């Protein structure tokens, strides 16, 4: 047995160790041939001989397993030394991923408002008539309710056409003061150079008790926001109409392409429309059970902002997955 143990100890590779095992326990191995002799023995002699062989086999297997573990660890360490990789090495030929320009724009918008302590609120993509229309003061005959503008399901639910329903859900679940934005996807039946059936909006809402909030607060906040997004641009507010705000306004900035001089993009007006806003209509407060409060709301299209920030002429190109375009925004 000592000779077998010394053979195991002298093995320097896994192959050598395996050859020793075969020479001992293989079909023609030393111990295998010894076990074959048991058939010629009888009684006590057979029992003693078998016990001795079993003990020898167990000791051999134990020594073999210890040596096997040692040689496996040695082989692994040698392989790791040969396969050393520098994980700090940057391969300039690899195609590193990057955020889509729409997501880059969305992140920049969210960054601004979260710095002003606006919360980020979410809502379902499939909405009901109450949250998407009725509670927002959109009457039954409003054009937005028409099937040519909104995606309806058979059970009269719909794909939300704006993120404004999130404002309603937030007011129904929270009490003033509220400072929130609702970023997310919305859906409308429209597809051309400046519209897609699915696009992204960020809508904001500020509500406080009493009459603390007015249009001047809204105007100041949006002017600062637009200068943060587009740099030193001029901002103007034009009277408009939205069912859920009164008074309402559309907001323009001086054209980022021609610096307000007039070009094809701004239709030679020098101005580009970027968002809508207004003081929340009192009828909206009635639907959510608010009393003696004041507030303002605003909404913008993220794709519109991305087009202006990155000077992308066709909105549809941002949804085609063309790497030649997307690689420019790494």
From Swiss-Prot:
Alphabetic keyword roster: Aminoacyl-tRNA synthetase, ATP-binding, Cytoplasm, Ligase, Magnesium, Metal-binding, Nucleotide-binding, Protein biosynthesis
Compartments reported by the entry: Cytoplasm
GO-annotated cellular components: cytoplasm
Cofactor stoichiometry and binding remark: Binds 2 magnesium ions per tetramer.
Catalytic activity: tRNA(Phe) + L-phenylalanine + ATP = L-phenylalanyl-tRNA(Phe) + AMP + diphosphate + H(+)
GO molecular function: ATP binding; magnesium ion binding; phenylalanine-tRNA ligase activity; tRNA binding
Residues the entry annotates as binding Mg(2+): 246
Record EC number: 6.1.1.20
Cofactor: Mg(2+)
Enzyme class: ligase
GO biological process, any: phenylalanyl-tRNA aminoacylation
Entry-linked InterPro entries: aa-tRNA-synth_II, aa-tRNA-synth_II/BPL/LPL, Phe-tRNA-synth_IIc_asu, Phe-tRNA_ligase_II_N, Phe_tRNA_ligase_alpha1_bac, Phenylalanyl-tRNA_Synthase, tRNA-bd_arm
Main location: cytoplasm
Disulfide bonds: none
CDD domains per the UniProt record, alphabetical: PheRS_alpha_core
Subunit structure as annotated in this protein's UniProt entry: Tetramer of two alpha and two beta subunits.
PANTHER family according to UniProt: PHENYLALANINE--TRNA LIGASE, MITOCHONDRIAL, PHENYLALANYL-TRNA SYNTHETASE
HAMAP family linked to this entry: Phe_tRNA_synth_alpha1
NCBIfam families: pheS
Sequence similarity: Belongs to the class-II aminoacyl-tRNA synthetase family. Phe-tRNA synthetase alpha subunit type 1 subfamily.
Listed name of the protein: Phenylalanine--tRNA ligase alpha subunit
Gene name, Swiss-Prot/TrEMBL: pheS
